Amino acid sequence: MRRNKPLKSKLNMNNHKTYLAFNVDAVRDSKMENLHTLNLLGDWQKRYPNRFGFVNIDYINFIATHDDLVETTVKSDFFALMEKADNLMLVVTKDTDADNVWLNWQISRAVNRYHLPVIVAFKGESVVTDETLKEYWNHIPQKIKKYIGRDSARMCYIPLTETKVEKALGYFSVNTQTYPHNSTTIY
């Protein structure tokens, strides 16, 4: 894995907007880590609106409480939100379903249609290494594994910590053409 050099970014200012890829079913299940993670990210955004700009966090909460939405409407809304984003973030936990259709669909569209750099954050880790990827391999979405195998998407891997997330979201952007080096960049 290639490591990026430490970034010298402006703390307390992030103008980039981030699309959060998520598993709708997992967000609805209050016993799963995904709901707790979503609440953590929402809390960061409320406390530091100039540092975290998740374009779809309110929509995720809306979807979680409405299981009667029509698939075509949801996909249309996802496209509109992805179009506003500078990057895509995915949080991988021990509960992440690597085969979830909606999660893999979002990743595929964000990469193939909007060319968003992907930031994969591992919950519960303070540092990410090659061993982290091996440990979580069964929980990494199939689309991410496919991109790793083909080296066909620009992705970086970080621990889910406030500082690392802020720096990665503030640095990688489709609009500034700032991407991770390849599909296996550990940041």
Language model segments and positions:
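A short acidic (Asp/Glu
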Residues: 30-32, 100-103, 130-132
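Conserved beta-strand termini and adjacent loop/short-helix elements that scaffold enzyme active sites
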Residues: 55-59, 121, 158-160
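C-terminal interaction surface of TIR/SEFIR-family domains
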Residues: 2-28, 43, 128-187
